[in-house]
Amino acid sequence: MACVLLFRLFLLLVLAAFSQGKRLGPTSPLRYSRFLDPSRAVFLRWDFDYEAEIITFELQVQTTGWVGLGITDRYTFVGSDLVVGGVLPNGNVYFSDQHLLDEDTLEQDGSQDAELLRLTEDAVSTTMRFSRPFRTCDPHDRDITSDTMRVLAAYGPDDIPKMSREHTFVKSIFLLQMLQYDDQDAPEDTIIHDLKISNFIIPEDDTTYACTFLPLPIVSKKHHIYKFEPILVERNETMVHHVLVYACGNSSVLPTGIGECYGSDPAFSLCSHVIAGWAVGGLSYQFPDDVGISIGTPFDPQWIRLEIHYSNFQNLPGIRDTSGMRLFYTSHLRKYDMGVLQLGISVFPIHFIPPGAEAFLSYGLCKTDKFEELNGAPVSDIYISACLLHTHLAGRSLQALQYRNGTQLQVVCKDFSYDFNLQESRDLPHPVVIKPGDELLIECHYQTLDRDFMTFGGASTINEMCLIFFFYYPRINISSCMGYPDIIYVTNELGEEASENPMENLMVLDNVEWTPENIKKAEKACKESQQTVLIKTIDEEVENTTGWIPDIIPTPRGPCLESTGGKVEPQDNTPAGFRAVPLALSGSNTATLRPLPMIAVLFLQGSLSCLLAMLQTGV
């Protein structure tokens, strides 16, 4: 009997070990932080347990009244969730999980899914710390995913929770960041090298792409770039949309000075292999500890093209700029050389989005079966560690999917809540393995309800792009792999007379009556047409191939967590959550197991002997 009880206790311990993550307590340090308001009176700290799917927030506000924190969307505060708390004058605390019935009215949720960890007040500020599951079973709670989260913070001067525009703030944040740079290696011999445009006068135009060619650091032996960050001139930040650094082939003949990147002189558009990138809303980016961008060998670039996209919508005159990119490099070599692969839809007008579209999906295909031929050497598996997603103002979501032998394997990276004003490189939870012959598909979702004109692919902010940059290792000689649809097929499917000249077909499409039916017909034709895939090497060699857009199987949401603590498999097919299909369903035969706690190991030794005894005696 004692053995039976011991064995049952062991099973309970094992189940507990695998079902519980590391809970953060009232005073545990939290890795991430942001100010949520311009005056820096609202400060958020947070951390999460990815395996247990629990996130912990700590909101500190300069008020002695109520405070609130939640998640909203890009269109309206209505339906936003908001956890509200404060300290009464008598020292008692109040705390509840609520939601917004309208932009002014709060209502308490029927299910209280936020757990209070700490709520304090001093003469200046109120601090509220609480935790909640990534996904609750309460329809009034927004899911916490790897998408861009629009974090809502609100407060008041007293203890009567009431929304006011003056004290309400929304900030787009990647809550589920995978790496914290303070935990990463910062070599003692770090050297800094700045790549800056030289005293450039920003033109009085809505959009300018300025390019200049600059040398990389001159080193006598191999070094690794392990981090980059933007250099932004104070007061010019609102004009700089993105900064890109392209590696040049060492045989390239490069121009001098500063020129329009995509203007009349094609020399200023030379070099197309991105090695570092920043866009509006982003911060610095540091590679994982075992990878870096190689410089200093005969195979490495010696020069780069610095591209800065300016948006001077107010047409301000005489603004001088010296923005650019700061590189951090070291002689302490990492295990792998990092590469950057650009995927998506080729950036020219064959990519189009009709006006007045509630939703329009565009696709860019990449086929890797020619990589080895273009690389000039055998290509082994490559590992994707991070990605940077990029569209312009009409973009609403993006995702990159991986296929092998015609079967969808996984979503490599995605953002179903994309924000043009927050474009940061984001680390993946685990490296994604790409094998030779795999196909990669980029899907972009656009909305053009505010436009009465066609939107074409192009460099201007009012044009569109559909791009995802993969940071991967080990580096190969491929710089980009982009697709575009057969515009002749699309024109015919819309009932128009097609021309062999692609630009004439675009003029025809520009005159189509874009009813909802024609918008859907165009989207369907673009997806069903044969894709031309352009593969480019670092040395600007280009190879074409063709392919077809595969079907996309939506990833089901994972189970929700009830306020009682139990997980529930929802009976829905909403393609929302950050979680992939469970390993048992994905065809994988491997899984990473977490180590058992020591107490379970000790019980295991006794339980196995008891189990053997029970089997022998028939108990």
UniProtKB/Swiss-Prot annotation:
Enzyme class: oxidoreductase
SUPFAM superfamilies in the record: PHM/PNGase F
Binding site for Cu cation A: H241, H242, H309
Amino-acid positions noted as binding Cu cation B in the UniProt annotation, renumbered to this chain: H390, H392, M465
Coiled-coil intervals: none
Cofactor(s), names only, from the UniProt record: Cu(2+)
EC numbers, comma separated: 1.14.17.-
Domain DOMON: 40-156
Gene Ontology CC annotation, any one: membrane
Pfam families: Cu2_monoox_C (PF03712), Cu2_monooxygen (PF01082), DOMON (PF03351)
PANTHER family hit by this protein: DBH-LIKE MONOOXYGENASE PROTEIN 2-RELATED, DOPAMINE BETA HYDROXYLASE RELATED
Designated name of the protein: DBH-like monooxygenase protein 2
Organism (species): Mus musculus (Mouse)
Top-level taxonomy: Eukaryota, Metazoa, Chordata, Craniata, Vertebrata
